């Protein structure tokens, strides 16, 4: 299993923030759903920080673990094909399993 770091930019206008909420769609939710669908495994991203409803980001960092054999550097291009226009994965790379975006 490898750990992948994503740098994510988004226009938060239509979202209830980063963190999954019961009252509306969030950036984290969209990423989890699209990554899980793409890799056909349960993917849960962990973000460096949370943003509130309506807040934008040019480079929020998140990680996820996966069994995929796809090179991590190609994930950003591949996943952007299925993300809405207001969420873009700017970069993706493999990081050490000990890497955590908050610490």
Question: Whereabouts are the PLM-identified features?
Answer:
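Structured-RNA-binding interfaces characteristic of tRNA pseudouridine synthases
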Residues: 1-103
